[in-house]
Structures are given as structure tokens and as C-alpha cells.
Amino acid sequence: MIETFRVGRYAMRYGHFVPRLYNYCRSLGFERQRMLPSRAFCSDESQGYPVMLLAQHFGTFPFDHGRVGGKVAINRHGPYAHHGEDLVLIQASHVGYNPDDGRFGVYQRHRTEGCRFGDCCGKLCGVLRWYEDEYAHACRQVQCGRLDGEPVFQIDNQYLDDSRSEGVFLRLDRMVETPPQPLTVLSTSKVFRAGHSIRERLGEACFGETPAPIGTALSPELFHFRRALAEGPEGHDLLEAALAPVMPALVTSPHPALDAARFVTQAEFDRTYRSILREPAFATKNVLFVSGLNIDVSPREGFPFPFTKFVPWAAYARLCDGRSFLLEQEQLVETLRRMPGENPDCLSFDGT
């Protein structure tokens, strides 16, 4: 699913995206004095510049639908609907990017000692960290080797204990001959004959005479995670719950933070779309919901704000004239790019 959300040529500067979005709203019949945008962004300060652009182009400060990590507070639909007639909800997860080394997930904090780089979305990266550490440990503790010339896996006893409450759980039926019967029992591990299909996939060279960690050959289809969700002041961790089904794909990705942000955007669009369908407060309103990804590039020297790009994912419109429709990524990007890049109604903050 994550791969269907393409980035590359679909990204556009926020300074181009917002006026095009405004002009698209006007083309749908939304009126300047009745429009109220709402943003569902993370609370990170890097998201401030997009909020400023929304205020400048729509002529009013946006309502706030955002929760940490870019989750949408769908329980705010009612209050939001009472504040405007033509409603424009923009949801975006965010991820940092350092163009100097091509890393996603990082952001330079210019107001810290030493202006050091750190996680861009601390919540998203914080959720990932436990899973990344557990995966890295499993990559070391599951080893490939040979016993009497036969390809085998030497598996730490920890990963053979299904009664554990959390951690990496191997899909043994995809790794070893079934039913799993150890060839040798060692002090802290057991040795199993490797299954035929995985031997073909990994190649005979992966099974050397001296046991070696399986490493990144421990691919997503060979394991899953189990973990009790953390309980915080707002209940269970909603972001972690959303990411849990795709954690094996995320921890094995070359860009975990990017893929996590893409998946959250996809999941939030689907969830919020369904909440809009059922929201009675929207029944007499024009509603446009746009979802995407904010890519934050740290401010360069001499510039106060980040260079932020928006990657559209999908949109849904439900209008008072009875029309309703979805725009998938390709359609949405093409629609926005057809819109004028200038907004004649754009505010001058000095003049307000």
C-alpha cells in the first residue's frame, strides 16, 4: 500500500500549493468570505510556515484539527462546521529531509545549542525506535550456517518462546522445514534445517560453514511484532496503533520515517473520509478534504523558515449542489497544477 503513494515529481512548494488550492476551492464555488480552512498537522514548529501561508491566502487563521503525528481529531468536525460555510480541511503528516546527504526523517534545530540535527517528527520517530531496536537485535540473534553440509538456521531461544508479551515473532513456517524439529539443541539456541523456498530465495552462499547473522535478509514476510500499546494521558497511543500492521515493512525500509509518514497519511485520509460521510454537521456545508505529506527541509542560513514541500495524496469533495467525488493522487496533482499559481485575494500581513 505504501508504495502507491508516490513522491518525486508529485511534490510542490508550499508557496505554489496553497494559492492553487485556494483557486481550486473558488472553482468549486466556495466563497472568499465564507471559506474556513482547517489544518490537521503535527504540533512541531516546522509546520508553522504552512499554517502562515494558509492564513495569508485564505484570509483567516485556520481551525485546528491536528493531533501529534498528523492524526486528525475527527471529534472536532462539529465545532469546525459551526465556524464556516465553505470548509477546507488539509491533513498532512510530515517528514524531514536533508538534501546534503539524502536522509529522510531529520531536521536541523537552529535554536538548540550547536544547531544540531534531530528527528523531524519526534513522535513518529519515537514510535519507530523500539521496533527498529527489536528488529536489529533479531537480525543478530538469528544466524545462517551449515550443519553436516546442510543449510540451517541457528535461532536464539528467545525467538522460539511464543508466550512472550512483546518483541519480534518469527514466522518459522516460512523459514524452517515443517514441522519445526531442532537438529541440535544448544545452551541458548536451537538449530533447524532451512526450508526449501527460503534456501532458494537467499541462495546457498548465505549459508556458510561458520554461522553468521541473517542481517537484513530477515525480510518483512518472515516476522511480525507483538507489543502492548502504551497508555498515556489521552489513552492508547493512536499513532502506534495505526502503524502497527506495517511495522515489519517500515523497519526494513531504507527510509523508515518517510514510509511511516506516507502510511499515516494514507490511513488518515481513509479514516477521515469515512467520518466526513457520517458527520451530520457537514450536511449543509461545502466540504473539501485534502490529504498529503509535508516534507520539511531545514532553513538555510539567512532564512527563518523551512523550505517545505507538499505531496498530495487524495482529496474528497462534498458540495451543497449534490456533487461528491474523490480525486486520487494523479488526478489531484493534475487538477492543482491546472489552477493559477497567483492568488489575487492574498493578504499582506502588513496591511492587516
Q: Which residues fall in each region the model found?
A:
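Divalent-metal-activated hydrolytic enzyme cores
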Residues: M1-M35, G59-T60, V68-V88, Y97-T352
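Short glycine-enriched loops at secondary-structure junctions
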Residues: F41-S46, V95
